Design a protein with these regions (language model features):
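A glycine-/small-polar-enriched, mobile loop at the entrance of the PLP active site in fold-type I
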Residues: 26-31, 48-54
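Beta-strand-loop-alpha "switch" segments that mediate conformational coupling across diverse proteins
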Residues: 42
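N-terminal auxiliary segments of SAM/dcSAM-dependent transferases
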Residues: 2-39
Length: 230
């Protein structure tokens, strides 16, 4: 009986994601990431800003960098650049001929990003578009990107997702950040515009026959969706 209980407990634990304590997060950052010096300096600089919570962590940056490499992406679209951690991480993983289009509404934040791009030697690969991303999306050619990353204002997430479905080629990837929103998406007692918008998009993608997808419990939750061929 004890063996049965032990086996059941082990099976249950195997199907669950670990609770990430601060100590475990630190362990992952120490041994699971090789953070580029420019990224480390940028992370430290951004932590001094009141909005530092908008920055992705080094583990997510490393994952996205590796994803660029294994997917062979050469054209990347980023919606929501902030101070440039994610764009720098992905641009460093691009081949020499690779290019990125980054969309943001803030010159103040993206001035920090520009310095990081220059320090990392990737500024020639990045085309920064200042203005509403919905308008920028309308100017981009269909099927012209291999990968898109959405990490901007949550009320516009659905519009960004639909726009990315148009501009990302079949077989390409769409990444959506903050899809778990500190766990609040799973708490029925929490009702606000941001959480409701994220829940609605999560449910939409789960039922969307245009993509294959998975929600990864990395950072604040990351959806990875592959655009199915028509």
């Amino acid at each position: 009986m004890q063996r049965q209980r032990t086996a059941y407990h082990a099976a249950a634990m195997a199907n669950r994601t670990l609770q990430m304590t601060d100590a475990l997060v630190d362990y992952v950052h120490r041994f699971g990431v090789r953070e580029h010096p420019v990224l480390a300096a940028l992370r430290d600089e951004t932590m001094k800003l009141p909005e530092h919570g908008m920055q992705i962590g080094p583990d997510q940056g490393a994952f996205m960098s590796l994803l660029v490499q294994v997917s062979g992406a050469k054209r990347i679209l980023e919606i929501g650049t902030f101070t440039g951690y994610s764009s720098t991480a992905m641009a460093l993983a691009l081949p020499a001929e690779g290019r990125m289009v980054c969309c943001d509404v803030s010159r103040e934040w993206t001035d920090v990003a520009r310095r990081a791009w220059s320090d990392a030697g990737v500024d020639d690969r990045i085309d920064l578009r200042i203005g509403p991303a919905t308008e920028t999306l309308e100017t981009l050619e269909a099927d012209s990107f291999d990968l898109a990353f959405i990490d901007a204002d949550k009320p516009s997430y659905d519009a960004y997702y639909e726009g990315c479905l148009r501009v990302v080629r079949p077989g390409g990837l769409i990444l959506v950040d903050n899809v778990l929103w500190s766990g609040e998406v799973a708490d029925p007692a929490v009702e606000n515009e941001r959480v409701s918008t994220i829940r609605a998009l999560n449910e939409k993608i789960a039922a969307d026959e245009r993509v294959d997808h998975v929600i990864l419990p990395i950072g604040d939750g990351l959806t990875m969706a592959r655009v199915r061929p028509a």
